[in-house]
C-alpha cells in the first residue's frame, strides 16, 4: 500500500493526490500523513489509516483507483467459496490475499497489497510451497475483510491449529496428554517410597520430607535474594531512555489482549493502549473475544476503536482458555515482536520501545521479557 508501481504498471497519480482530489483528506492532512509516513518509515496509506483520516473502505477504494485495479467489497460481493483450498491457507495468510472469482481461466485474488501478494507468490513458488496457479490477477479489498473471510472459511482448521499444533509437533512440550510415562514413573516411585517410609519409619520419613520441603523453599528465598540486585540493575537499564530506537527503526509490534466477559474494563484498556508511545502504523493490536461473548463484543464496537485495533472472534470450543485464544489470534499476527496484555493492565507508555531496545542488546538466547504492568 504505497506510491510504488506494481509490475507492468504505467505512471499514475500519487495516492496522496488521489485521496486529496477525491475530498477524502485535506491538504493539511496530506502534509501530516506524509510527515508521519516519513518519520515512521511506512507507506502513505498506512499512515493515513493510522492517523484516522479516512475509513479503510475509502482508503482501499482510492488505492484501487491509484493502481488502476478493481475494488471489491467482499461483504457486498462475497467470494466464490469453491475456490478456497485448505492447502493454500498459509499462502492466504502470508499474502493477505483471497480468491474471489474466476474470469475465464484467470483467478482473481483480492488483497490490500498486491505488491506484497505478488512477492509472496514468487517466494513460495521458489521454495516449492503451495501457491495459486500462474494465470491470476489482483483486485483491491480491505485488509480486515480478508482476515474475517479467512476466519469464516477456515474456522475448523484455525481452531484445530490453535488447540493441537503444539501437541502434534512437539508433544514433549504439551500438557494435553498429562504426565509422560517417565514422569508418571518418577512420581509413582516417590509416592511409593513415602508410603513405605511412613509405614516402616514414620519419624525418619517426616524428617526427610520436611528437609526436602525446606530445601525447596530455601531455593525460592535464594532466587528472590538474587533477583534484588538483578532487578536494580534492570531498573537502571530501563532508565536509559536515550538508547531507545528511533520511530523509523521500530518493527511492527503485535499486542494480544484476550478478553472474556470483561466489557466493563474495555474503556480503561482502550485508554491504556492509546497512551502507548509507538508509531500507530506499526501497531498490530488484536482484541481477542469469544464469539458468543456478546456484551464484550458490543462494547468493543461502541468504543470506535482505531483502525490498527482488530477484533478477533474465537469460535466456541474447548478448552475455553486465554492461552488457546492467544494461539488462535497469533495465526494472524503481523508483528516481529508479540506482547500479551490482560484487560486490567496499564503498561507504561514506552514499554514497547524499551522491549525492542532490550531485545536488540540481548543475545539470541533471550526470547521473552517480563515487564511491569
Label every PLM stretch briefly:
Residues 46-131:
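Polyanionic, low-complexity intrinsically disordered segments
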Residues 124-164:
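Extended, hydrophilic extramembrane loops/domains of integral membrane proteins
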Residues 48, 109, 225-232, 314, ...:
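Active-site cores of enzymes that catalyze phosphoryl transfer or operate on phosphate-rich substrates
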Residues 158-247:
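N-terminal membrane-anchoring/stem segments of glycan-assembly enzymes
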Residues 236-373:
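Internal catalytic domains of large membrane-associated glycosyltransferases
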Amino acid at each position: 500500500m504505497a506510491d510504488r508501481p506494481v509490475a507492468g504498471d504505467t505512471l499514475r497519480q500519487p495516492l496522496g493526490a488521489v485521496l486529496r482530489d477525491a475530498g477524502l483528506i485535506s491538504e493539511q492532512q496530506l502534509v501530516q500523513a506524509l510527515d508521519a509516513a516519513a518519520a515512521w518509515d511506512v507507506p502513505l496509506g498506512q499512515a493515513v489509516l493510522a492517523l484516522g483520516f479516512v475509513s479503510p473502505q475509502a482508503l482501499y477504494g482510492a488505492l484501487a483507483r491509484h493502481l488502476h485495479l478493481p475494488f471489491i467489497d467482499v461483504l457486498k460481493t462475497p467470494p466464490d467459496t469453491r475456490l478456497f483450498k485448505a492447502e493454500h491457507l498459509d499462502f492466504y495468510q502470508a499474502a493477505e490475499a483471497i480468491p474471489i472469482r474466476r474470469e475465464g481461466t484467470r483467478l482473481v485474488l483480492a488483497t490490500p497489497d498486491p505488491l506484497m501478494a505478488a512477492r509472496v507468490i514468487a517466494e513460495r513458488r521458489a521454495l516449492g510451497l503451495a501457491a495459486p496457479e500462474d494465470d491470476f490477477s489482483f483486485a483491491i479489498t480491505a485488509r480486515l475483510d480478508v482476515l474475517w473471510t479467512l476466519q469464516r472459511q477456515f474456522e475448523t482448521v484455525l481452531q484445530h491449529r490453535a488447540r493441537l499444533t503444539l501437541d502434534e509437533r512437539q508433544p514433549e512440550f504439551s500438557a494435553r496428554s498429562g504426565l509422560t510415562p517417565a514422569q508418571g514413573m518418577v512420581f509413582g516411585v516417590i509416592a511409593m517410597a513415602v508410603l513405605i517410609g511412613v509405614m516402616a519409619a514414620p519419624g525418619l520419613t517426616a524428617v526427610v520430607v520436611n528437609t526436602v520441603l525446606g530445601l525447596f523453599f530455601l531455593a525460592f528465598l535464594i532466587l528472590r535474594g538474587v533477583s534484588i540486585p538483578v532487578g536494580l540493575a534492570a531498573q537502571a537499564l530501563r532508565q536509559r531512555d536515550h538508547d531507545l530506537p528511533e520511530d523509523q527503526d521500530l518493527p511492527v509490534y503485535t499486542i494480544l489482549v484476550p478478553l472474556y466477559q470483561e466489557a466493563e474494563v474495555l474503556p480503561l484498556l482502550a485508554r491504556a493502549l492509546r497512551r502507548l508511545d509507538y508509531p500507530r502504523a506499526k501497531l498490530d493490536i488484536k482484541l481477542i473475544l469469544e464469539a458468543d461473548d456478546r456484551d464484550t463484543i458490543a462494547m468493543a464496537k461502541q468504543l470506535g476503536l482505531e483502525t490498527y485495533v482488530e477484533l478477533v472472534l474465537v469460535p466456541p470450543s474447548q478448552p475455553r482458555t486465554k492461552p488457546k485464544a492467544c494461539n488462535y489470534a497469533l495465526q494472524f499476527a503481523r508483528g516481529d515482536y508479540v506482547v500479551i496484555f490482560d484487560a486490567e493492565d496499564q503498561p507504561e507508555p514506552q514499554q514497547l520501545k524499551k522491549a525492542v531496545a532490550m531485545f536488540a542488546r540481548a543475545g539470541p538466547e533471550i526470547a521473552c521479557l517480563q515487564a511491569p504492568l
